[in-house]
């Protein structure tokens, strides 16, 4: 029998294994486009049912805890994973549309998904009849630019708290209580203020506004407590000693203590840490002679801590000791180096500094500096931290506590609150247009003037024209009426005239408070057209072939059957 050399045999086997590990399934043309479109349809159908005031909820199974009930388009889109790989690719591409829209505008994900499906479907149909996909994409993009320009022209600024409440109410699925709460929060902390959403502990929604600088570090020692009402430290008109370095030596803080004593004002020390004889001296003097003093660890880590301490220094009119820029030693401290605040409240978990005495010009300059950093950063985490710092400096933080009788109810409501909050911010940023899909319908007539260079580009414009009808049609369909009839009636009118799906009547949507943020509508059509028109240009799709499970049985193990002879061991009884 002929045998291969061992090395050749091994290389042949390893090549087979490599091929098995990297085997791909490649499909072409109309067949694969049809499969991707099936995936797009499944995802879009699941998301579209949530659209409009009479949209339904979707229940999503979770690997842990209770199923999630939501009406949030992006949450539904993210949850969808299809078994067929080619269908799943179609679904995932439209999922990206929803994600992109959510990241940029914070709302409008359902509109984006509905538009993406319409553009992809029409595009595939035209390509199957011989149209050039690249030219169709160019036509789509030309049409979308015209739509965006028209939306900008239609847009009007949001100015009153009532308009803010209307935007929030629409995005919260018609929940007026949420709309009013968000409007109130924005009124209190300003348009640039930070509004955070947390789980409440009661059945009702609550709004708490934290003014001044609050951070999550409490007193180092409970011996600093001076209030009979709860375990906290309360000072009025206090001095602030800020240090970037750890304080261990008592000699370094004696000058500051003497200054505070001479001024007859309490002293709050905020440093990287305070320990050793410095801490024990403060505690002993607090207990024995009633020295008005408290020590707190500085919040954050690394550069973030350094920046936060500088914010505090600017807000209170002091300096940060230990900072490389300020070469002043703690021992050489003067009164002008200490910050001043009107009120201080310190609990075991957090510290609140109110009414800082810093110069307004310095605070404004610092706030503008942070705004520039927010624009430059690409990290979401970094952006969030910068916005928190900006809010502390500017106008405080509003805390929305979402209440409910169960975790499922609270989570569902939180999704709507987040949507409403994002929509409101978008409206403040770029203004509003008539809602209910009307703004997109008003853009249709403007597409007549789009200049194209060939017939296929004209087809691309026509695809967008048809897609623009879909949001209004879907909202009407979910409300149980004939979508095509509603679209035709709204198209025959002009301006802000549209369909109120909640009440089932027509009228001026701006007057009715049915409005969409311009940024949300613009982002939805931009993201939907970009991904969907690219999808239509695909001619081949490559996926991995799943590896077969189960390793082959080990050879030679069959001989172990002889162990049956061990039955004779029964005689040992």
Curated annotation (Swiss-Prot):
The keyword Transmembrane helix does not apply. GO terms for cellular component: mitochondrial inner membrane; mitochondrial matrix; mitochondrion. InterPro entries: Chaperonin_Cpn60_CS (IPR018370), Cpn60/GroEL (IPR001844), Cpn60/GroEL/TCP-1 (IPR002423), GroEL-like_apical_dom_sf (IPR027409), GROEL-like_equatorial_sf (IPR027413), TCP-1-like_intermed_sf (IPR027410). It is found in: Mitochondrion matrix. It comes from the Eukaryota. Residues 1-57 form a transit peptide. Pfam families: Cpn60_TCP1. Keywords: ATP-binding, Chaperone, Mitochondrion, Nucleotide-binding, Transit peptide. One of its GO terms (molecular function) is ATP hydrolysis activity. Transmembrane segments: none annotated. GO terms for biological process: apoptotic mitochondrial changes; cellular response to heat; mitochondrial unfolded protein response; mitochondrion organization; protein folding; protein import into mitochondrial intermembrane space; protein refolding. Prevents misfolding and promotes the refolding and proper assembly of unfolded polypeptides generated under stress conditions. Belongs to the chaperonin (HSP60) family. NCBIfam families: GroEL (TIGR02348), PRK00013.1 (NF000592), PRK12849.1 (NF009487), PRK12850.1 (NF009488), PRK12851.1 (NF009489). PANTHER family: 60 KDA HEAT SHOCK PROTEIN, MITOCHONDRIAL (PTHR45633). HAMAP family: CH60 (MF_00600). This is Heat shock protein 60A. It comes from Drosophila melanogaster (Fruit fly). The lineage of its organism: Eukaryota, Metazoa, Ecdysozoa, Arthropoda, Hexapoda.
